[in-house]
A protein has these predicted regions:
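Conserved catalytic-site region of short-chain dehydrogenase/reductase
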Residues: 77, 111-116, 163-167
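Conserved beta-loop-beta element that borders a ligand/cofactor-binding pocket
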Residues: 144-166
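N-terminal Rossmann NAD(P)H-binding glycine-rich loop of SDR-like oxidoreductase domains
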Residues: 4-24
Length: 220
């Protein structure tokens, strides 16, 4: 049994990863700033209130976990909206992960993926919606910070397909494809994956590690 601590375990991706992990018999510590009224009750599931920017909390959770999962929205931060950049939380996360020999898995975004070999990034294309550039840029910034990490933490960053989110939950198929830094599309040009199949790929990486200190992407 693996102990998995999920920051953002009540969100769209985090809850899917939580449920997949619990279904495999793992212990899950779900860290959230506010416990939802409909929080599930399950064997092996524990909720803790807290924030990923609390370095002391990160340290205590890392001491118990085999894997730390960061599944929190990449708010732009620094814009007066009261939200901090997730990149600012990464130093304490990587340090704690390295200290306690825990893996660090990050739910990333698709916008930092290249649209084809040689670029550009999806984020940098003219068609990319302006209203999402702040969040997408924050996710890309976090990936850059991980790539520059010097703690030696064993991290992995999983970029989903372009059409991934609660607006497009899809249906579980039990299948997915893995790529590297280039956006994956199907034969009709669509880039999609359901929440359940993204979680399947994420927990497969936890159970059978194949990616170390790198980003990979999953899609149909």
């Amino acid at each position: 049994m693996t102990t998995i601590a999920i920051f953002g375990g009540t969100g769209y991706a985090g809850s899917a990863i939580r449920d997949e992990a619990l279904g495999r018999g793992h212990r899950v510590i779900s860290v959230t700033r506010k416990l939802p009224a409909d929080a599930p009750v399950a064997d092996g599931l524990e909720f803790r209130l807290g924030d990923v920017h609390d370095a002391a909390l990160v340290e205590s959770v890392a001491a118990e976990a085999d894997v730390i999962v960061l599944a929190i929205r990449f708010a732009p931060g620094g814009s007066g909206d009261g939200e901090l950049r997730l990149a600012d939380a990464l130093p304490s996360l990587t340090a704690a992960a390295a200290k306690h020999s825990a893996r660090l898995g990050v739910v990333g975004g698709a916008a930092s993926l290249l649209v084809a070999e040689g670029g550009p990034r999806l984020l940098d294309t003219p068609e990319f919606p302006a209203q999402f550039k702040g969040e997408a840029g924050s996710a890309a910034e976090a990936l850059d910070a991980l790539r520059a990490d010097t703690t030696g933490a064993d991290w992995f960053f999983v970029s989903p397909a372009a059409a991934f989110g609660s607006y497009n939950p899809g249906q579980p198929t039990g299948k997915y494809r893995i790529g590297g830094d280039v956006l994956l599309t199907d034969e009709s040009g669509k880039s999609e994956i359901s929440g359940a199949d993204y979680a399947l790929a994420f927990v497969d990486e936890i159970d059978s590690p194949k990616h170390h200190r790198t980003r990979f992407t999953v899609a149909y």
